[in-house]
A protein has these predicted regions:
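Sequence-specific dsDNA recognition surfaces
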Residues: 18-31, 46-73
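Coiled-coil heptad-register positions
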Residues: 169, 173-176, 180, 184, ...
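Basic, amphipathic alpha-helical recognition segments used for DNA target recognition
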Residues: 16-21, 92-95, 103-149
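Non-catalytic DNA-recognition/assembly elements of restriction-modification systems
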Residues: 3-27, 179-185, 190
Length: 203
């Protein structure tokens, strides 16, 4: 049996994000270790996905990078506070990230490729915990979030389609607002169709 787009339902299975890798974060940086300018940008939750307003020394960066968890190029960074679930693809350039507020899954790409994860995250698969007035994404929220995955080959096919739509949306960013909105809605429709399936039992 196949679904729209030619995806065979029997190829899909449901897993928890915690099954594909450890949830990781950088070493805590103390305020005294930062400065308004310097060698290595330090992204806090307020500057994540934007321009940094704090920096750390190259020595501190190299020390912590070698001793503690640090993302690999292509890993998908997730904001656990502020704008919950905002994602940034780590580009491999020297940078450091605020502990606990910015996390990633040290993903096993033999199970799920990072770019597929990036698009899945846009669907916000996690349940957000609230304490008082502050919403937060805890490690357990991420680890227990369920996603549906096909074979690696099918993941690559889906990513290829969504990447093309993504590029198309960006290419018309200078166009008419109505045209841009229509294209974005089309992109979101196909993204949801390709990624959203009823929960399946693990094979």
């Amino acid at each position: 049996m196949s679904t729209e787009g030619g995806t065979s339902e029997c190829e899909w299975r449901t897993i928890k994000l915690g099954d594909i890798g450890k949830i990781s974060m950088c070493k805590r940086i103390m305020k005294s270790e930062t400065s308004p300018d310097g060698d290595i940008p330090f992204y806090k939750i307020g500057t994540f996905g934007g321009e940094p307003n704090a920096y750390i020394s190259k020595e501190t960066f190299e020390k912590y990078k070698s001793m503690y968890s640090f993302p690999k190029k292509g890993d998908i960074l997730i904001s656990a506070a502020g704008t919950i679930g905002r994602t940034v693809v780590y580009d491999g350039e020297p940078a450091y990230y605020q502990d606990s507020n910015i996390v990633w899954i040290d993903n096993d790409e033999t199970k799920v490729i990072n770019r597929y994860l990036y698009y899945v995250y846009q669907l916000s698969p996690w349940q957000i915990s609230t304490g008082g007035t502050i919403a937060r994404l805890y490690n357990d929220n991420i680890a227990n979030a369920k996603i549906n995955i096909p074979s690696i080959k099918e993941q690559e096919r889906i990513v290829s389609i969504l990447d093309r739509f993504d590029k198309l949306c960006n290419d018309i960013s200078e166009g008419l607002p109505a045209e841009i909105e229509a294209r974005r809605k089309q992109y979101e429709y196909y993204r949801d169709k390709l990624l959203s399936f009823e929960e399946r039992k693990n094979a």
